[in-house]
């Protein structure tokens, strides 16, 4: 028995290719259950995948649940914002159940393992690739815990690249909720700069703004800007440009050959966006830079290297889970 625990939307996305493979396979795959919380609930409901919820006093509820289910392995997302993930790791350690979690995007490594001011690590951490591993170790995560697997969701979406759409996509992330003022900017300053630059180049009619499930749409009720709940991959299909901070939409946009930029006005910490940190897309901090960028043609020639790196991710995750379910 494997127990999957997901907190954020991207965590559910990471696991879904494996769940699909097992559901559609006639082979004797491991028995599994899913526990979902946070934004991942929306994802599993949309794909009609059943899951359990943990109610009541969280520590006692998790302890009771584990004593009933008795998994061999707990595989968790590492969202840094969902208490349930940490509680599962801590309770599993008490009763000797092996735990692993996975990195779904190249950012915020260390903060994923801090709970109430203390470091909390699973028995294993599944890294995306050697670059991810290197950055995690440099951030202070113990190398002995890390195993490179890949990113099954990104592998899947990179296999079929749709033609360019007609929109400029602005996906808003809940920066104020997750990071406060620590980055030097938030979703409001990101949006203000982006709107000014798009207006300068006369492309406001192409604009499409979406919000993360953790952002309250009522925040925009009295603002002169139209926003919609994000529809995930469909929003990127409909775009030719993705302007974000450090979101998954930017990674997919890059893989799909969209024009992508990381907009981080007043950034005062190490760049959390892998794409701009690695020099694959520009890091933009003012409206002049952004308006110049919006006048440039789409030119994304480096994406093949990232796509090639992702090949085999699902097979490696499947092999890992099969092995650990009988260990």
Locate the predicted segments by residue:
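Donor nucleotide-activated moiety binding/catalytic core segment of transferases
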Residues: 56-69, 210-256
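Short acidic-hydrophobic, aromatic-tinged amphipathic segments that line or gate anion-handling sites
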Residues: 52-58, 226-230, 279-293
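Short active-site oxyanion
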Residues: 29-33, 120-125, 206-207, 239-241, ...
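Conserved catalytic-core segment of nucleotide-activated headgroup transferases in glycan assembly
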Residues: 13-21, 154-221
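Catalytic binding pocket for nucleotide-activated donors in carbohydrate/polymer assembly enzymes
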Residues: 119-122, 248-310
């Amino acid at each position: 028995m494997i127990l999957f625990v997901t907190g954020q939307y991207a965590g559910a996305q990471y696991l879904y290719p494996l769940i699909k493979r097992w559901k559609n396979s006639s082979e004797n795959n491991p028995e599994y259950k899913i526990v979902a919380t946070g934004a991942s609930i929306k994802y599993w409901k949309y794909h009609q995948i059943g899951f359990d919820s943990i109610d009541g006093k969280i520590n006692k509820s998790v302890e009771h649940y584990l004593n009933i289910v008795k998994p061999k392995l707990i595989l968790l997302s590492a969202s840094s914002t969902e208490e349930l993930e940490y509680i599962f790791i801590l309770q599993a350690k008490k009763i000797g159940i092996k735990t692993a979690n996975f990195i779904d995007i190249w950012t915020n490594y260390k903060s994923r393992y801090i709970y109430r001011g203390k470091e909390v690590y699973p028995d294993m951490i599944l890294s995306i690739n050697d670059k991810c591993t290197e950055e995690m170790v440099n951030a202070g995560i113990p190398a002995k815990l890390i195993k490179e697997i890949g990113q099954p969701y990104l592998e899947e979406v990179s296999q079929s690249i749709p033609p360019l759409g007609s929109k400029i996509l602005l996906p808003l992330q809940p920066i104020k909720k997750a990071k406060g003022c620590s980055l030097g900017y938030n979703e409001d300053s990101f949006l203000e700069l982006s709107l000014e630059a798009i207006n300068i180049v006369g492309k406001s009619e192409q604009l499409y703004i979406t919000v993360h499930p953790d952002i309250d749409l009522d925040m925009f009720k009295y603002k002169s800007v139209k926003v919609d709940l994000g529809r995930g991959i469909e929003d990127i299909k409909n775009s030719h440009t993705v302007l974000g901070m450090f979101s998954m939409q930017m990674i997919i946009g890059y893989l799909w050959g969209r024009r992508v930029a990381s907009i981080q006005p007043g950034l005062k910490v190490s760049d959390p966006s892998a794409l701009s940190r690695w020099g694959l897309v520009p890091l933009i901090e003012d409206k002049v830079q952004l308006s110049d960028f919006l006048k440039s043609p789409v030119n994304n020639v480096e994406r093949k290297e990232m796509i090639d790196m992702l090949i085999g991710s699902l097979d490696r995750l499947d092999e890992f889970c099969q092995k650990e379910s009988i260990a």
